[in-house]
């Protein structure tokens, strides 16, 4: 069989855009330069040293001493898959807290590995009520795992974790935590609250291209995985093998994403230079200013202030405004990307990411002015001067 040779392709058409949606976020220029450094072999001593350094930097960002800390190949969804692939046995009872689309996704993933899933639910835009979890634990004392989303990307809810963690550990269960939209933007208290497995993604508050899933595992969780009675059903995400590659053995399991690891290493160096606590405070300070600007514009925010995530803000679009047309206007005129709603909030809200380098006064000013213009184009009038003034208060 003869195949037609493709025509000479034109140059790729890409342009700089301001990514202020739910992710990916813009990467720092230093991170992009790091990706272009010379390729090394995945067992080259120089690359193994970069892996070691990256692990230590991840421990700093996760605020943990867990030795089982690594960057899994794949996006944040691979982190979720790894968490449940390694911990779930067929027929095991797993409690999953669902307060948005990504909690729902947890139930799907756990079910595919044979879990009997018990759902603890709250409405989208609200956190999980510890009393509801306590009830589920009491009714299901044989459950082994509790899974929860720390930062629900579909709603912008930051889940309070102190009571949740205590309930889980008092019951002798393992706690699996999704921190895809919180790591690097808000405190992720892995050791303080004894999270057993915590995973994230590189493309949000870490300001790195998508492709790796930072993951950290407690000692007791690691021992359980090591001694599980049956092999992990997902060969590629089997932590028993991957841990040996990231550990002293340097056991070959897969070819690591070499240049993505360079990028993550550089992104984590930038965080270290700023200081993790300074970074958290910057996200909080800028988010509060942006919330004030939105309220000045007449926007109703989805989440009650005490449960808002600083790295992702959600608001209802005004009556009579087509939210998709607003997003298209921002992209066409300003090259700014923001997100729409998911699930039951589709068509009703916008999701705006203030992540890493994009959590800055200059970028919030540009976005706020552009939003006022986009709303005005649909006949919704807001006081742009007042909104911009609110950013500086």
Which sequence ranges carry the predicted segments?
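PLP-dependent enzyme catalytic core of the Aspartate aminotransferase-like
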Residues: 344, 348-393
